[in-house]
């Protein structure tokens, strides 16, 4: 099982880090994530052997010889040294980034509490500890004088508050 934990860096379930539940886990370092390398990500492996095998294929499956020789088809999934250096530097502040996102989520929860038809999504139970990479707000137009999520998004735009509608389920696209 490959666990897609692209947006979950720092989130836990039952005290366990997201990205560690599958045989492999994948994190994203895209520009809008907890840390960035301007793109790319990380593959979480359970064993050193799996990590070495993954790196072998991710670096063109080149055999250890004094010339280019390949017995397998490989790929070029290497991150540049500059981008990796940026990522290593950001690892030093990842906890601060997560704390900031959680604080922002708390502010939205506090300030939107009491508005009929607007709810800020929380952890589904005490077993979860989200990084709150995004603060998600659900709008019930029936309780918001007929205002839809898009109506609210457009209003926020006039106030210079960035927002967007989240992803639609694949079966609804």
Which residues does each PLM region occupy?
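Hydrophobic faces of well-ordered beta-strands that scaffold small-molecule active sites
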Residues: 1-3, 25, 163
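Catalytic PLP-binding core of fold-type I/II PLP enzymes
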Residues: 1-15, 47
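Hydrophobic packing within well-folded, soluble alpha/beta domains
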Residues: 1-2, 29, 41, 101
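Short clusters of hydrophobic/aromatic residues that line enzyme substrate/ligand-binding pockets
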Residues: 9, 18, 35, 75, ...
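PLP-dependent aminotransferase class I/II
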Residues: 12, 48-173
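Active-site acidic short loop of glycosyltransferases
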Residues: 15, 22-23, 114
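Active-site PLP attachment segment
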Residues: 20-58, 81-84
């Amino acid at each position: 099982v490959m666990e897609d934990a692209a947006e979950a860096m720092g989130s836990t379930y039952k005290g366990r880090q997201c990205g560690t539940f599958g045989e492999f886990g994948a994190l994203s370092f895209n520009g809008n994530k907890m840390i960035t390398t301007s793109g790319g990500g990380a593959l979480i492996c359970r064993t050193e052997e799996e990590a070495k095998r993954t790196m072998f294929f991710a670096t063109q499956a080149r055999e250890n010889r004094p010339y280019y020789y390949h017995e397998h088809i490989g790929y070029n999934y290497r991150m540049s040294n500059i981008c990796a250096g940026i990522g290593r530097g950001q690892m030093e502040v990842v906890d601060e980034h997560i704390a900031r996102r959680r604080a922002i989520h708390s502010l939205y929860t506090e300030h939107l509490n009491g508005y009929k038809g607007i709810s800020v999504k929380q952890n589904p139970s005490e077993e979860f500890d989200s990084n709150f990479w995004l603060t998600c707000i659900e709008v019930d137009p029936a309780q918001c004088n007929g205002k839809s999520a898009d109506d609210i998004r457009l209003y926020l735009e006039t106030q210079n508050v960035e927002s967007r509608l989240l992803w639609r389920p694949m079966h609804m696209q």
